[in-house]
């Protein structure tokens, strides 16, 4: 196989995990080359889902697209220990950030942020180029973010956020067990003078917030929970889980105990949204951090 991969598609004939399917159908590719396709984000499922896991389950009838490495070279120019580009076109960027890395600057820190790194990257294509913030993740949270490449796209995303954003999913490890296996946490959130958020069951002038949850598994004192935002308030998931007596492990600001894996156990691993300019449905997933499995392992 040459170093330049042209775009083509392969139909799935029987259920199989991704790497097993690739090894069987792409016999001209070495194992290393197949792994390279995965690591360089060149594999897509049915034209919508970027494949990031070697064991992603495929179903008979699915279509796996292998996209040209030439289209990925622009992405590969950005190399940063705390940040990876997942998708990029002329309008948007989708990136993954590690925990402990700021989305935007603060009074104390301006440079070590996703925003600054992406802005510097954009300037390599022209001094007039810049990036535009669409939404944020807390410093302590790892996960996926979408940025705009123009004011027009930023406004299109933000003004139509509830219409365009179809799903945002998080995974958390909490201390304790939620009252039900599935449910919705509802509360009004307000901020005190120390910039700490609080939850109230009654309307006290705060912002109404809803978080849907599903318990994925439990082990000892810990539970792994998948969460979906119905609203997007500051620290919403963190304060909601604290309000029901199940604070996120490592989240000392909101009642969490010390983390055995040395991090706040919250990960924004799924984004599904309609592209603001093309109308295409975009779906991105980033695997749950392997360290989470040390506390609760879910098959």
Which residues does each predicted region cover?
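RNA pseudouridine synthases
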Residues: 2-299
């Amino acid at each position: 196989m040459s170093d330049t991969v042209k775009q083509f598609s392969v139909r799935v004939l029987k259920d199989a995990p991704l790497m097993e399917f690739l090894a069987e159908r792409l016999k001209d590719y070495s194992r290393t080359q197949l792994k390279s396709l995965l690591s360089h984000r060149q594999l897509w499922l049915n034209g919508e889902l970027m494949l990031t896991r070697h064991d992603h389950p495929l179903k008979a009838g699915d279509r796996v697209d292998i996209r040209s490495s030439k289209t990925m070279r622009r992405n590969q120019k950005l190399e940063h220990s705390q940040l990876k580009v997942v998708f990029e076109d002329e309008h948007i960027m989708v990136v993954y950030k590690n925990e402990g890395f700021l989305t935007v600057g603060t009074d104390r820190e301006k440079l070590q942020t996703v925003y600054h790194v992406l802005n510097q990257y954009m300037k390599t294509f022209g001094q007039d180029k810049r990036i535009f913030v669409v939404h944020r993740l807390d410093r302590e949270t790892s996960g996926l973010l979408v940025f705009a490449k123009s004011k027009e796209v930023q406004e299109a995303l933000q003004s139509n956020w509830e219409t365009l954003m179809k799903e945002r999913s998080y995974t958390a490890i909490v201390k304790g067990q939620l009252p039900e296996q599935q449910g919705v946490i509802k509360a009004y959130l307000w901020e005190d003078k120390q910039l700490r958020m609080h939850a109230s069951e009654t309307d006290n002038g705060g912002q109404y917030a809803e978080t849907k949850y599903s318990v994925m598994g439990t082990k000892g004192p810990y539970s792994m929970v998948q969460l979906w935002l119905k609203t997007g308030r500051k620290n919403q998931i963190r304060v909601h889980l604290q309000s029901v007596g199940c604070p996120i492990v490592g989240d000392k600001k909101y009642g969490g105990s010390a983390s055995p894996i040395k991090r706040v156990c919250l990960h924004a691993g799924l984004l599904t949204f309609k592209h603001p300019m093309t109308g295409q449905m975009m779906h991105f997933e980033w695997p749950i951090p392997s360290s989470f499995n040390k506390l609760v392992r879910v098959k």
